[in-house]
Regions:
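C-terminal alpha-helical interaction appendages
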Residues: 1-154
């Protein structure tokens, strides 16, 4: 059960919080992070196992607990926003294999806005927050285009 939870947590991080993935890899802290996090839910998992709770249910409950502090994902939010508002650029990044890299760069460019606006789950549906981010993303993409790193799709 412990290894399954580690694998599922790592998979979640890779897809939803790649900034954390890179940070942990840079510090060689992946194993320690996963170990510490999974240990925090093992007592609950063992209790549910002893109560004959199906493994799939245990995994789902534990993974929800393990990912609570990782939500909402700025990366996922910005990826969706990039697709909605700048679809051609999103497709270009995806085709060139730079989508994750560029979304992480956009996260960096927008980090102050995320902090000052206290990004929460409710921010996902807040049009004001979205409208605050769009000019910053546009500015980033314009700088990228001026540097020659971004080609407009035609």
């Amino acid at each position: 059960m412990e290894n399954i939870l580690k694998e599922k947590l790592w998979e979640y991080i890779i897809h939803n919080n790649p900034e954390l993935m890179y940070k942990l890899q840079d510090k060689y802290g992946v194993s320690e992070y996963l170990e510490d996090k999974v240990k925090s839910v093992l007592v609950l998992a063992d209790e549910m196992l002893s109560e004959c709770t199906p493994r799939e249910i245990i995994e789902e409950i534990c993974l929800n607990l393990l990912t609570t502090e990782l939500k909402p994902s700025r990366f996922t939010y910005l990826s969706s926003l990039l697709f909605e508002e700048f679809e051609g650029t999103y497709v270009d990044f995806a085709r060139s294999g730079t989508l994750t890299y560029e979304v992480l760069n956009i996260m960096g460019a927008c980090s102050e806005l995320f902090e000052t606006n206290n990004f929460t789950a409710g921010s996902n549906t807040d049009p004001n927050f979205k409208n605050t981010l769009i000019p910053k993303i546009t500015d980033y993409l314009n700088k990228l285009q001026k540097s020659g790193s971004l080609q407009k799709s035609g």
